[in-house]
Every structure is written in C-alpha cells, then in structure tokens.
C-alpha cells in the first residue's frame, strides 16, 4: 500500500513538472507569447475581452514565453503597473498607449537599449530600473509626476535630468555618480539614497551610508 502511494505521488510530481497547460489563444493574435503570460498570471487557459480589461498589473517574466515586444499590450486598457524581469525584450512599443500606467519596472539585463518611449508616459508616478548597464535616463526629465525613483546597478554618472522634478523618494544604489546638481526644487523629498556611488563633490551632504542629510534640502528651502 505504501509503495503504491509512493509511486502515485511520484507520478503526480512528474505530471506537474512536465505537463504544460494548453492555452486557447486568439485574444492577442499579434503577440501569442504575451497572451500566454497573461493566461498564466490569471490562471486561465483562455482569455476574454473582459479579462483583458480587468488586468491592472502585469509581470512579464522572461522565463515564460520569451516575449520580445509588447505589441498587443495596448489591449490592457486599465493596466496600471508593468514589470519586465528578466527577458529578451527588445522594444517597448506600443507602451505609450497605456494611458493609465502609473508604475513601471525593468530589470535584469533586458536587451532594451532605448527607453526614451517611457518619457512620453506622463502618468507615471513610480519607476524602477535595475541592472541595466549604461542606459540613457535623460527621458526622466519629462516625467514631472514621478514620486518614487529607483535606479540601481545601471552605471549612470549624473542625475541632471532629475533636478527639475519633485520626487518624494529617490534610490540610486551602486551607480557611478560623482557629484550632485542643484536639487533645490526637491521640496517634497523624504529619502535620497546614494549608497555605492563615488561621490566626490558635495560630499559633505552624504553620510557614510550614502544617505543625503535632509537638512541639505531644508537649508535650500529657507
């Protein structure tokens, strides 16, 4: 009896590991790989138009589907949060059609080299970029509604494009920032973390942990 139960258990594990669900695709014919990811997230084998409208967050994991583009994502008309980690992504089009998007996160060495389209999504309040070496973040200057900014392990050398924004939290871990621009416009700032950066100028405003003394901003406001 015990042997029979053991064998049955092994068979169930094998089935769970190797039998993949069969998806009935067709709602996003131009990008079936993206549709599969949505099916997996919603735990459904087939999507309806209502399902697409109910998706308010999407996690595009490169381990599933190897999505290279976001073509068809505009069908998710109520999408608010988009995470891409990691993957083969080479293009963000047509991301600018996501009119309700408020947060985006991209990480782990995607093949994306041009993030300028993100600069057109003025509804964004949160952005996270991690492990994206040598990216150009100049597009951030257009995102005046950003409250939280996370940029880590991206090799950026300056944050001049952020000086005219007014964020609440900025985390810039492990980059190559050596100096800071005038940040007197940051009247709402609560946290600025520069740990892991070779700050050479304005060193007097950064403590040993890489945190900027908030008194620096208060002084600018007096």
Predicted regions span which residues?
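Surface-exposed cap/linker segments adjacent to membranes
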Residues: 22-42, 46
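Hydrophobic h-region of N-terminal signal peptides that target proteins for export
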Residues: 11-19
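Short, flexible coil/linker elements and helix-boundary hinge sites characteristic
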Residues: 1, 20, 43-46, 209-210, ...
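Short boundary motifs at domain starts and secondary-structure transition points
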Residues: 47-51
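N-terminal Sec-pathway targeting helices
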Residues: 1-12
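Concave beta-strand-loop units of leucine-rich repeat
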Residues: 53-117, 123-139, 145-157, 161-178, ...
């Amino acid at each position: 009896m015990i042997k029979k139960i053991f064998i049955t258990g092994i068979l169930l594990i094998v089935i769970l590991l190797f039998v993949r669900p069969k998806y009935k695709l067709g709602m996003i014919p131009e990008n079936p790989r993206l549709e599969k990811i949505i099916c997996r997230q919603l735990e459904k084998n087939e999507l309806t138009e209502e399902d697409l409208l109910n998706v308010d967050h999407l996690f595009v994991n490169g381990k599933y589907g190897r999505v290279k583009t976001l073509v068809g994502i505009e069908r998710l008309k109520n999408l608010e949060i988009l995470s891409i980690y990691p993957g083969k992504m080479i293009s963000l089009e047509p991301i600018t059609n996501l009119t309700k998007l408020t947060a985006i996160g991209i990480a782990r060495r995607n093949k994306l080299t041009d993030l300028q389209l993100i600069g057109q999504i003025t509804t964004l309040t949160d952005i996270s970029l991690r492990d994206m070496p040598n990216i150009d973040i100049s597009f951030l200057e257009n995102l005046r509604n950003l409250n939280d900014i996370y940029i880590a392990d991206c090799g950026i050398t300056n944050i001049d494009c952020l000086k005219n924004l007014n964020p609440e939290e900025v985390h810039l871990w492990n980059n190559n920032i050596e100096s800071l621009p005038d940040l007197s416009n940051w009247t709402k700032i609560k946290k600025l973390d520069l740990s892991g950066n070779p700050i050479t100028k304005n060193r007097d405003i950064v403590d040993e942990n890489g945190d900027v003394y908030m008194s620096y901003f208060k002084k600018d406001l007096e």
